[in-house]
Amino acid sequence: MEFNEKLQQLRTGKNLTQEQLAEQLYVSRTAISKWESGKGYPNMESLKCISKFFSVTIDELLSGEELITLAETENRSNLKKIYNYIYGILDMMAVAFIFLPLYGNSVGGYVYAVNLLSFTATTPFNLAVYWSAFAALIIIGIGKIISTHLDKEKWGGIATKCSLTITALAVCFFAAAREPYITVLVFLLLIGKIFVWIKQMGMK
């Protein structure tokens, strides 16, 4: 008997609905439905809760092959989380581009490297774009970390797409504005994000 059949049998044996079992295990009814339909397995924490609630061992719930599948799924899930956290941190690193002296201020025929707070040798429009891009990346990075912590994969996916788009546009804009230092660093940031994104895609 497969895990999904065992879970359904144990639940009906206690005369519980999927909703009632979900409340006991502190998961959603959708999760119970997915497990009972054979579309996925619970993580180790949920599996321990199921084992304790029904007073059965994990070995009784899962066959050897299912345990291997669960371990592989858990490993992929953990790696994806790590990559998501790294991605969020990369976005939040945009705060460094505000405080590092990466912009050229021309004063009396000399060019001085200054941070964005002191940068005046550009148009108000350009400054607005610089600040908007960095603020957006920082906010997206925070959102990415929060969505990962809350297991909101859909939100994380949207954040990733927005982040890649903004970073790519920022590279083009800084290059057009002839800001070599920040262009190179944002380009390297984009490469790092693409690398992490490709690794994430490989986990599916």
Swiss-Prot record:
Gene3D superfamilies the UniProt entry points to: lambda repressor-like DNA-binding domains (1.10.260.40)
Main location: membrane
Extracellular compartment spans: 103-126, 176-181
Listed result of changing residue 64 to D: Constitutively active. Does not affect DNA-binding and cellular localization
Transmembrane annotation, as ranges: 82-102, 127-147, 155-175, 182-202
DNA-binding region: 18-37
InterPro entries, sorted: Cro/C1-type_HTH, Lambda_DNA-bd_dom_sf
Source domain of life: Bacteria
One GO molecular-function entry: DNA binding
Disulfide bonds: none
Job description of the protein: Functions both as a membrane-bound sensor and a transducer of bacitracin availability to activate transcription of the bcrABD operon in the presence of bacitracin. Binds specifically to two inverted repeat sequences on the bcrABD promoter, irrespective of bacitracin concentration.
Protein name: HTH-type transcriptional activator BcrR
